[in-house]
Amino acid sequence: MNEKIAVVTDSTTYLPDEVKEQLRINVVPLSVIIDGKSYREGEELSATDFYRKVKEAENFPTSSQPAPGEFIHLFENLKEQGFDTVISIHLSSGISGTFQNAASAGELIEGLNVVAYDSELSCMAQGMFAVKAAEMALANEPLDQIIQKLDKIKQAQDAYFMVDDLNNLQRGGRLNGAQALVGSLLQIKPILHFNDKQIVLFEKVRTQKKALKRIEDILQKAVQNKTAEKAYVIHGNDLAKGEAWLAQLEAKFPEVTFELSYFGPVIGTHLGEGALGLTWSIK
């Protein structure tokens, strides 16, 4: 008899509600703290509300990971529903303790095999793992094949972000003050990416147009190497900017399936409003 596998992820995937429902993906929320008040991402605070509240806030927002107890409660619940195995897929362990909390909680549940999976990224780049794992679990595919597929996606995957304002990264501890000041004066648009589970500076470019062109050049190589079959354009509360880039990319790369996503509250605390990202991998 096949094992019954459940898929868990966290709110930083920013998956559409209909996808979560259709694929039965369980989501544990991270929280954002604005002026001392904590909001559960996606449950008590939408992306639109977050960016509005940040403009009115006195202090810079911070984020917090789910407590191990949240995972224990969910895992126990899934066990009661008859699941034998849980694949728990989370944002990079290099930027959050969420993955570690899921892994620790999983060890405490008897009679349930919890496999914690570090996406080493976040946002829809992480969402791609959750979607694929859930599709395969619903098709009754075995655990080892699901993990093998996730590893193949990880091998092919890449993600680049361009931020509009360096101050958020500096305040979030991602960039020092001098670099942020120089960046603001020179109108530098830094391109960031994930390297060894951390968000790091990839290149400094003078204009947004040049930054987007540079990311497109990297995508071009990935398309040639057959590692970019599906891609997501991700925007920070700027739908028009996201849609415009999406249209350009669809025209330029007809062989790639593109979709639009967004940076929600937790990731928005680091990247800020107006950020743009692109992630891709195999299907």
Curated annotation (Swiss-Prot):
Claim: S-adenosyl-L-methionine is one of the keywords in the record: no
Lineage, top ranks: Bacteria, Bacillati, Bacillota, Bacilli, Bacillales
InterPro entries to which the protein is assigned, alphabetical: DegV, DegV_C, DegV_domain_contain
Domain DegV: 5-282
Residues that coordinate or bind hexadecanoate: S63, S96
Domain of life (superkingdom): Bacteria
Function: May bind long-chain fatty acids, such as palmitate, and may play a role in lipid transport or fatty acid metabolism.
UniProt keyword terms in alphabetical order: Lipid-binding
GO molecular function, one term: lipid binding
Protein name: DegV domain-containing protein lmo2514
